[in-house]
Amino acid sequence: EKQIAPARTFCLLSEVAGLEKQGLIKGGNLGNAVIIVDTAIDNKEVEFFKERFGIKFYEGTRGLYKSQILRFKNEPVRHKTLDLIGDLALLGKPILGHVTAIKSGHKGNVEFAKLLRKEFKDQF
């Protein structure tokens, strides 16, 4: 619980504006999310993030947002693990086995949970 639970969600800077327009990051802030600057940004984008989110980026910056420090060097992987644990908990029963996930996300996790529920319906 101390190795997985503290892992924050993360997103790529290139996705932030789209997520915001879809209303998907209403509770997101620099305390509960890690922003990975995956693309060089221009002055127009710098102003957008400053005005909309109060975040000051610098043109051409890449990597983690300047003031952020990862809680673990592999924090994004740990958060994906946390997502998987949470999504599979929706089954309402423990999984007696080993799960390996590659490039997982909520959509795939939920589909996997549905498949398990269908396959083992007599045990639910």
Identify what each model region corresponds to:
Residues 1-124:
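Short acidic-hydrophobic catalytic motif
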